[in-house]
Amino acid sequence: MGKQNSKLKPEVLEDLRHQTQFSEEELQEWYKGSLKDCPSGHLSVEEFKKIYGNFFPYGDASRFAEHVFRTFDTNGDGSIDFREFICALSVTSRGQLEQKLRWAFSMYDLDGNGYISRQEMLEIVTAIYKMVGTVMKMPEDESTPERRTDKIFRQMDKNMDGRLSIDEFIEGAKSDPSIVRLLQCDPQAATQS
């Protein structure tokens, strides 16, 4: 993402090859597309929310998009550059399950203290419910954000301290694939659980 060149510099390309799961060709294609969509080289939270919202026309994706943006913006400068975007995309689209879960944990851990509180989980789950609108039919025990949060905590909070450690989060998700679908808000969650 930048005005100067339509191709990544060889040293940047090499670095991104090692940091991501993308081939050189894929990285160049993503870079070319990002120049077209974002000539400034940086995506603001408002621009990101607008783009993200296009994928969820029947709901309000703005709150969830803000959480995704915060997690993509690894240097915390309030914008996403190509490196941040492509590294996050690599984890979320091609990473191993544990990498994806660690990434998701960092999004849910709003205050960055290494734990997900019930309130943090509720904030994210509420944002997901607003994003999907009425498109997804939820089972009765997940019919509200509060109920879904309670269900996740019942299944994951093994030491019952009211917060999820990264180990509880990862183990809980790995031991019950329906939780992964719940966390990712997979529309098939209701039919496969």
From Swiss-Prot:
Keywords associated with the record: Calcium, Lipoprotein, Metal-binding, Myristate, Repeat
GO molecular function list: calcium ion binding
Keyword Protease on entry: no
Annotated residues for binding of Ca(2+) 1: 73, 75, 77, 79, 84
Protein residues bound to Ca(2+) 2: 109, 111, 113, 115, 120
SMART domains listed in its UniProt record: EFh
Residues reported to bind Ca(2+) 3: 157, 159, 161, 163, 168
Lipid modification (N-myristoyl glycine), residues: 2
Misc: Probably binds two or three calcium ions.
Entry protein name: Neurocalcin
Organism: Aplysia californica (California sea hare)
